[in-house]
């Protein structure tokens, strides 16, 4: 069976960037496990804050964590009390100085992670999955998305047999590397079992060399024979010419037949 490559991992280094930015030689595995631990702690503490993604950068003895959220007020807390508590917890678990940055997301309807979490939360509250998917697609397209695709799989509406439901609008070119596609996968835990929610959002094309400018395709140059231009080379042959050659060949064969009879 065919499998789809991860849209973000497929574009890393081209139009997408890594969410962990550091280099290590000997203690690579330790730092990798530390990154996983930091992400789990932040996701647990900020479960209801609408966290879309977490970026981690490292220096010698310092860790810089950037949290992109749709609800910065919940993350920061009253007079910054909650963010200070979170920073202290991260420093205690890592034993390093942690710098915590909070970035606000102004259009959460175009973030695949937040859209998937919203659909999963509605499914947990027994909202119709069809309605949740359709509303999410409509909101994303209304705010400028060029294409949206949502997939829900599992025992939908408590059915005896698991099935897959799709909702889509616009186009989502998965094989175009310059296509800016956001992707997320979330699970909804219901009394009937676990339901998977996948979201693809196509935001337009991004050109690595000239961002913000549309690059027109270069005209193709065909190889022509000496003495002929490209237009003459690509001009199709007339049907009459082929018919004429066929008639001449038939006449030649007929002439040979006449000589054999004599």
Swiss-Prot record:
Chain segments carrying region Disordered: 211-262
Q: Which UniProt keywords apply?
A: Ribonucleoprotein, Ribosomal protein, RNA-binding, rRNA-binding
- Say which species the protein is native to: Roseiflexus sp. (strain RS-1)
Give the similarity note.
Answer: Belongs to the universal ribosomal protein uS3 family.
One cellular component GO annotation, for this chain's record?
A: cytosolic small ribosomal subunit
Pfam families recorded:
KH_2 (PF07650), Ribosomal_S3_C (PF00189)
Q: Name one GO molecular function term.
A: mRNA binding
Query: Where is composition skewed (Gly residues) in this entry?
Result: 243-255
Name this polypeptide is given = Small ribosomal subunit protein uS3
Task of the protein: Binds the lower part of the 30S subunit head. Binds mRNA in the 70S ribosome, positioning it for translation.
- Give start and end of each KH type-2 domain: 38-106
Q: Which InterPro entries match?
A: KH_dom, KH_dom-like_a/b, KH_dom_type_2, KH_sf_prok-type, Ribosomal_S3_C_sf, Ribosomal_uS3_bac-typ, Ribosomal_uS3_C, Ribosomal_uS3_CS
Disulfide linkage: none
Complex formation = Part of the 30S ribosomal subunit. Forms a tight complex with proteins S10 and S14.
- Residues passing through the membrane, by range: none
**Highest taxon in the source lineage:** Bacteria
Q: Which GO terms describe its biological process?
A: translation
């Amino acid at each position: 069976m065919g499998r789809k490559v991860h849209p973000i991992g497929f574009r890393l280094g081209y139009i997408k960037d890594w969410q962990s930015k550091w280099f290590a030689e000997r203690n690579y595995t330790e730092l990798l496990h530390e990154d996983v631990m930091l992400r789990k702690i932040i996701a647990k503490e900020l479960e209801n804050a609408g966290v879309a993604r977490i970026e981690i950068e490292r220096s010698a003895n310092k860790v810089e964590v950037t949290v992109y959220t749709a609800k910065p007020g919940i993350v920061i807390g009253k007079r910054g009390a909650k963010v200070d508590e979170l920073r202290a917890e991260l420093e205690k678990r890592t034993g390093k100085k942690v710098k915590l940055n909070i970035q606000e997301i102004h259009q959460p309807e175009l973030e695949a992670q937040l859209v998937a979490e919203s659909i999963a939360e509605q499914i947990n509250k027994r909202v119709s999955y069809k309605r949740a998917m359709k509303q999410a697609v409509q909101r994303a397209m209304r705010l400028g998305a060029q294409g949206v695709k949502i997939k829900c799989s599992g025992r939908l509406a408590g059915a005896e047999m698991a099935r897959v439901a799709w909702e889509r609008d616009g186009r989502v070119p998965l094989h175009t590397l310059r296509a800016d596609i956001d992707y997320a996968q979330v699970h909804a835990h219901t009394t009937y079992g676990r339901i998977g929610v996948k979201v693809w959002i196509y935001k337009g094309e991004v050109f690595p060399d000239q961002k913000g400018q549309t690059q027109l395709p270069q005209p193709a140059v065909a190889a022509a024979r000496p003495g002929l231009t490209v237009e003459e080379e690509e001009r199709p042959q007339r049907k009459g010419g082929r018919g004429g050659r066929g008639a001449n060949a038939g006449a030649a064969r007929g002439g040979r037949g006449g000589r054999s009879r004599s």
